[in-house]
Amino acid sequence: MNKKIKLALIGTGGISGAHADGILKHQDKIECVALCDVSEQNLEARAKQLGGSPARFLDWKKMLAEMGNGIDAVDICLPHHLHAPAIFDAAAAGKHILCEKPMCINLDEADKIVKAVKKAGIIYMSAHNQLFTPAVQEIKRMIDGGAVGKVRWIRSQDSFILPNTALKGQWRANMKFQGGGELIDTGYHPTYRLLYLAGAEVAAVRGTMGRFLHPMDGEDTASVQVRFTNGVIGEILTSWVFNRPYGTHDLHVIGELGEIFGTGNMLYHLPVGFKTPSEKILKEANTFHDQINCFADCILKGLPPPHGPEEGRAVLQIILKAAESAEGWQKNTGKK
């Protein structure tokens, strides 16, 4: 493809604002020609942010039918339970897809999505934006370069305090729409970071969950242990009820030759035998800008996406297995 990509944004609330910023940053490659949402207020806000005169729709099926070849790709930023239906319709219409996390809310949907994408011959990219953070990319480079030798243990964390009124009356508090609790939401980020750095398939998963603060069906805090087929032990800690001293998310890798700790654009490397780690300040990055740029390049240059539907399924499988192993956590913590 040698032209500018014509994109439709399906879902114009919340996180779509960050996606829109990425579109504006890379207007030389991609432009938003249509918006779809059931909320007129959301449509108005996003149209104002993007500028121009994108077509507005209340129904994505109608949008896909009426716009036809006027759309090359879609960016899906809907509530979780609507991801799969929108993906199926966009794939059937032959549109390339960027979809927010999670890809869907169960493995049956995930398997059907993998098949639908292959059948349509389109590019599907999972919106794993935190893989574009400087610390994640540098840690991956160091692991692959042997800086810590054989990796033994990886911890991936994403935690912050969400006000206890934030979920009141929201779809995220409802298991039917959310597909789970915090782990399938914010916790999705540290899960895909762990999978990316471990570089192997999952052998076993065990989860522990709790709900300490928020009025919701699912958990607001989760701890997950993962064993990989290459022997790496992984840990995920994610929560909406406590802060971290190093920012909202961080990574810690221990190998036979040393350790790496990273958060945001800061990196610390402690080889075996040293008492003081070396410190490296990495270049700042906007992961949503980089994500949109990557998606556009995949379409324009015919490149495979760095994280497609298979990766989306693998992340979801860890989350669902953790939830299954933690079944009964509400009763165990006295929460009903």
Give a label for each model feature.
Residues 112-129, 149-154:
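Rossmann-fold dehydrogenase core element
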Residues 19, 54-116:
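Beta-loop-alpha module in the N-terminal Rossmann-like domain of NAD(P)-dependent dehydrogenases
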Residues 1, 191-266, 289-303, 322:
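Contiguous beta-strand/loop segments that form the cofactor/metal-binding neighborhood of enzyme cores
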Residues 38, 281-293:
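Active-site loop of classical SDR/Rossmann-like NAD(P)-dependent oxidoreductases
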Residues 130-215, 329:
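Predominantly a Rossmann-like dinucleotide-binding segment in NAD(P)-dependent oxidoreductases
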Residues 1, 73-75, 229, 297-336:
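C-terminal helix-rich "cap/oligomerization" subdomain common to oxidoreductases
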Residues 1-51:
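N-terminal Rossmann-like dinucleotide-binding module
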Residues 99, 105, 124-126, 236, ...:
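Hydrophobic residues in well-ordered beta-strands that form the structural core
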